[in-house]
């Protein structure tokens, strides 16, 4: 008879609290068509809590506020330049994100000093539902709307001493709405509002780029593996 005994490897679990600061760019029906060009003119700030439950995997919870804008006159497309519409919007976002390190990050071993990482998750966003009044090119605020979104991206992080980490990341937020720029508003008064325009089959994207600084703490436990 062969008795199989599970082998459990237990290590200290570290947690982090931190702040992300950077900029955004928007991809949709109004403004530039550049895919990745975050700008500090549309800033983004996010508080986060992270639980590193292994040397490669972490769960990140976020609460952030970001601004976006689109200006047709800055676009390289002639039709958008001629149309000359513009908007600005404020985005509140709450996210749960799974982060995967390329290299092992063992906080008890200073030789584990840096790693690239990938991440994906689920977000819930609050934004302003906009519309364009008749004969006007600047979007007006109508009401607040909510939607889900999928954050995904890449980054790199490095340790600063024993307790601090500095990171840089690029995040793409795919939203389940096409209303961030006012191109498909929720109509209240169709007499005073311009009709919808653009591609209704393509939802809006927001690109984030910036730096994070976090503080690590805690000595909980996690199970690394079973045999």
Please name every model-derived segment:
Residues 13, 39-43, 90-94, 114, ...:
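Residues that define the transmembrane beta-barrel architecture of outer-membrane proteins
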Residues 11-14, 55-56, 104-115, 160-163, ...:
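Short loop/turn motifs that connect adjacent beta-strands in outer-membrane beta-barrel proteins
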Residues 161-227:
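Predominantly the C-terminal beta-signal and adjacent terminal strand-loop region
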């Amino acid at each position: 008879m062969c008795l199989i005994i599970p082998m459990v490897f237990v290590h200290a679990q570290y947690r982090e609290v931190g702040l992300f600061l950077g900029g955004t760019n928007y991809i949709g029906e109004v403004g530039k068509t550049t895919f990745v060009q975050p700008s500090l003119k549309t800033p983004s700030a996010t508080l986060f809590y992270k639980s590193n439950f292994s040397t490669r995997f972490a769960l990140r919870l976020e609460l952030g506020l970001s601004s976006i804008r689109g200006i047709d006159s800055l676009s390289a497309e002639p039709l958008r330049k001629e149309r000359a519409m513009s908007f600005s919007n404020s985005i509140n976002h709450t996210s749960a994100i799974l982060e995967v390190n390329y290299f092992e990050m063992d906080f008890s071993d200073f030789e584990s000093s840096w790693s690239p990482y990938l991440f994906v998750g689920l977000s819930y966003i609050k934004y302003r539902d906009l519309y364009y009044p008749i004969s006007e090119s600047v979007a007006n605020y109508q009401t607040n709307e909510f939607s889900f979104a999928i954050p995904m991206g890449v980054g790199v992080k490095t340790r600063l001493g024993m307790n601090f980490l500095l990171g840089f990341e690029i995040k793409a937020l795919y939203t389940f709405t096409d209303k961030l720029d006012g191109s498909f508003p929720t109509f209240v008064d169709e007499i005073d509002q311009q009709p919808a325009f653009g591609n209704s089959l393509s939802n809006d994207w927001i690109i984030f780029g910036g730096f994070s600084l976090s503080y690590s703490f805690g000595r909980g436990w996690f199970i690394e593996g079973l045999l």
